[in-house]
């Protein structure tokens, strides 16, 4: 039995549908992300689990117990929001101890638990500081420590990094995942940032318009997207429109502007001859050669734009009436291309994904 289960969960706000017929199973100790654009229903789903929002239909179970109609305080769930909610009139110690004081634990036990939580989040020595004396990342650590110290069954994180700058977000991604691994707590993470989900998650549920479109590991979601929407939403994508010529098992031959290429069909997709299909190839999977190269070409193209980004050089290549973006590592031996150079665009056979 899964540790957390959503069974047929829907949430309607009047005539507006926020979540529709949601089924999810999350294992104990798993880092599970709900990923999708704004308004897709991911935060509503999280708040239904926390008890702040009541489902219109369906049931939610935690460790075999139906919690659908329980108030938040009866669910043993901790939640961290993006705005931290640190009490400005309290010290770091007092903020972290707040939940323990409410539970009327002995003073010595409170100090022991708070000291342990401070050490866990790397904030030992900050006990007497106030909110105004903390950076954004430090505030987020305090908010997380305040939740972890009460030892909840489940940790919910609702876009906790969105208020931080890029450098701090990168640091906090790895820090949160390390903390989760260390504590072993079942964690459900809400984000619209695919990088956060790919970096930290054991599994991801991609949502749109109140529905789950695909559930899988980060590798499965990135390399085997179930739809064009997911291919576009997760990472950067080259999407080439074509027509299925032949299907042999999981391999689909595709006509793209008069050139035949192949793509692999993902597990849940099928195609038939003559059907319109989209070929997905990630920018980092594509290779370029000048037209006199010996490798067999996949598509012929012309360099239309060159973007220098330090560690990589990006080329926008026109192939027929479509374009692909190619990302090349910037090495000392890199053979630079110029605008309007004619090139061959190719990739490994298993790097192209056919999406009906």
Predicted regions and their residues:
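Helix-to-loop junction immediately C-terminal to a conserved catalytic motif
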Residues: 50
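Conserved coupling/switch loops of ABC nucleotide-binding domains, chiefly the family-specific signature
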Residues: 56-59, 109, 209, 241
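Non-catalytic connector elements of ABC transporters
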Residues: 237, 247-356
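The feature captures the beta-strand-to-loop junction immediately N-terminal to the Walker
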Residues: 35-37
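ABC ATPase nucleotide-binding domains
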Residues: 31, 72-78, 82-229
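Conserved ABC transporter NBD signature motif
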Residues: 58-66
């Amino acid at each position: 039995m899964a540790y957390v289960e959503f069974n047929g969960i829907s949430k309607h706000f009047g005539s507006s549908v926020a979540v529709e017929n949601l089924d999810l199973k999350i294992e104990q100790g798993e880092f599970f992300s709900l990923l999708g654009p704004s308004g897709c229903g991911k935060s509503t789903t999280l708040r239904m689990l926390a008890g702040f929002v009541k489902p219109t239909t369906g049931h939610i179970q935690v460790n075999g117990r139906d919690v659908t109609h329980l108030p938040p305080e009866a669910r043993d769930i901790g939640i961290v929001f993006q705005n931290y909610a640190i009490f400005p009139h309290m010290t770091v110690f007092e903020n972290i101890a707040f939940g323990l004081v409410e539970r009327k634990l002995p003073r010595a036990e409170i100090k022991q638990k708070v000291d342990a939580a401070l050490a866990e989040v790397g904030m030992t020595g900050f006990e007497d500081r106030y909110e105004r004396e903390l950076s954004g990342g430090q505030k987020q650590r305090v908010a997380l420590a305040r939740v972890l110290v009460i030892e909840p069954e489940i940790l919910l994180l609702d876009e906790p990094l969105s208020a931080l700058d890029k450098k701090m977000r990168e640091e906090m991604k790895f820090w949160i995942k390390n903390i989760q691994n260390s504590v072993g707590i079942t964690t459900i993470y809400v984000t619209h940032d695919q990088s956060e989900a790919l970096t930290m998650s054991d599994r991801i549920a991609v949502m749109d318009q109140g529905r789950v479109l695909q559930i899988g590991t980060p590798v499965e979601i990135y390399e085997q997207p179930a739809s064009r929407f997911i291919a576009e939403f997760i990472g950067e994508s080259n999407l080439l429109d074509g027509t299925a010529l032949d299907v042999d098992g999981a391999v689909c031959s595709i006509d793209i502007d008069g050139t035949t290429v192949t793509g692999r069909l993902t597990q849940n997709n099928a195609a038939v001859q003559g059907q319109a299909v989209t070929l997905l190839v990630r920018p980092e999977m594509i290779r370029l050669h000048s037209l006199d190269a010996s490798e067999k070409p996949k598509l012929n193209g012309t360099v239309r734009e060159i973007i220098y980004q330090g560690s990589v050089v990006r080329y926008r290549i026109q192939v027929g009436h479509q374009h692909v973006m190619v990302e090349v590592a910037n090495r000392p031996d890199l053979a630079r291309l110029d605008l309007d150079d004619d090139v061959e665009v190719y990739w490994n056979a298993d790097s192209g994904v056919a999406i009906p």
